[in-house]
């Protein structure tokens, strides 16, 4: 019985591996609503969706010099009414939720024309909204008619599959990206232009091509190397391109033939970053929290042991309850170190040292050994 069960388990893993490989590093030319239904449940780690915005443009836009503005007036962005758009939104979001892994997440980007309707659908379908992020465009298109504020931003909604999902968030990497400051939810990034903008005979290939810098931040924040990323509205292929560069696997669906071909050519020219340079900083929160007192309880460090600063000028004794005592103060390893330094706070794990096999080491070394054993 055990052997049969093992064989069945192995066979299931093989089937799962083959199914997942069917969607690795591929893009297809097809209707998203039809293609999503063909994908097995719980296939993807992350979804990035840039759906039609339903801009409702009834007239062409012109500049003050009467030249025509290259705006979004494509058929794929046109819907009969809000009801039809809502039905479309619910249909593709439902499929995306089904094919996300239980700890997966989704990003959806939009403008004021559609993002509030999309956000309602996201909540109604049981996703759990984590953040809304404002993409402030450094170089937005002006409001040529002067009838409204210049529309200088787009909104991204980031949501996990459910409230209980253990989604990926590379906090330390994003903090490092932002000069050691917490990454905020307003991102100042330029729109796509220059050499990055795909053109054919001098004309933009795609009217709403997203900048690679935006997807770089999204994928770095919420996915890991070798994760499988889905873009159900691939467009000119920015998501797949950045995923390939960052060592993520991608699967894209694009209905428009000319966009699909442009994305295909773009991916052929894209070179991945060397694997050695793709490691991300580990989150401190992912490490188990071990109080200093636990080292005392477990006998790793004994009451009465002397601990000292790096220069061995400050000495304190360890008490049975995990507190420490010094001439100037007593309390936790952090509190006593802060008092001695005259500061509001101090990381006692790195301030205090002890002697191990005749060598002075930070007491954090003892904690790290305990963590590695567990």
Pin down the residues of each PLM region:
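Intrinsic-disorder/low-complexity peptide segments enriched for small residues
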Residues: 1-3, 11-17, 21, 55, ...
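Intrinsically disordered, charged low-complexity linkers and terminal tails
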Residues: 3, 245, 257, 262, ...
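Core catalytic lobe of class I
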Residues: 7-253, 258-260
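S-adenosyl-L-methionine
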Residues: 20-35, 268-289
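Short alpha-helix boundary/capping motifs
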Residues: 124, 150, 246, 270-272, ...
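Residue-level detector of short coil/turn "hinge" positions at structural boundaries
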Residues: 129, 250, 274, 344-345
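Acidic/polar loop patches that form or flank catalytic/metal-binding clefts of enzymes
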Residues: 167-169, 275, 347
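Catalytic-site neighborhood detector that most strongly recognizes the C-terminal catalytic loop/helix
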Residues: 254, 266-269
């Amino acid at each position: 019985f055990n052997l049969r069960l093992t064989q069945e388990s192995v066979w299931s893993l093989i089937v799962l591996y083959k199914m997942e490989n069917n969607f690795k590093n591929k893009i297809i030319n097809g209707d998203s609503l039809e293609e999503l239904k063909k994908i097995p449940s719980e296939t993807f780690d992350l979804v990035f969706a840039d759906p039609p915005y339903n801009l409702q443009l009834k007239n062409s836009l012109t500049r003050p010099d009467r030249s025509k503005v290259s705006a979004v007036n494509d058929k794929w962005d046109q819907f009969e009414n809000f009801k039809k758009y809502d039905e479309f939104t619910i249909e593709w979001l439902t499929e995306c939720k089904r094919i996300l892994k239980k700890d997966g997440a989704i990003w959806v980007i939009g403008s004021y024309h559609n993002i509030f309707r999309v956000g309602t659908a996201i909540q109604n379908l049981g996703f759990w909204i984590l953040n809304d992020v404002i993409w402030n465009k450094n170089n937005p298109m002006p409001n040529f008619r002067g009838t409204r504020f210049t529309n200088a931003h787009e909104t991204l909604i980031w949501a996990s599959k459910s409230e209980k999902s253990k989604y990926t968030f590379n906090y330390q990497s994003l903090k490092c990206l932002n000069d050691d400051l917490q990454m905020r939810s307003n991102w100042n990034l330029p729109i796509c232009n220059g050499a990055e903008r795909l053109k054919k005979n001098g004309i933009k290939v795609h009217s709403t091509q997203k900048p690679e810098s935006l997807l770089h931040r999204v994928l770095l924040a919420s996915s890991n190397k070798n994760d499988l990323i889905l873009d159900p509205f691939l467009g000119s292929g920015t998501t797949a391109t950045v995923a390939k560069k960052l060592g993520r696997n991608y699967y894209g669906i694009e209905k428009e033939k000319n966009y699909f071909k442009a994305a295909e050519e773009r991916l052929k020219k894209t070179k991945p970053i060397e694997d050695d340079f793709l490691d991300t900083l580990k989150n401190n929160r992912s490490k188990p929290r071990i109080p200093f007192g636990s080292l005392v309880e477990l006998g790793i460090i004994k009451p009465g042991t002397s601990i000292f600063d790096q220069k061995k000028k400050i000495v304190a004794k360890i008490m049975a309850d995990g507190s420490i005592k010094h001439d100037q103060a007593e309390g936790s390893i952090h509190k006593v170190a802060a008092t001695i330094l005259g500061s509001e706070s101090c990381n006692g794990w790195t301030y205090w040292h002890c002697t191990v096999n005749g060598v002075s080491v930070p007491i954090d070394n003892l904690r790290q050994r305990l963590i590695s054993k567990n």
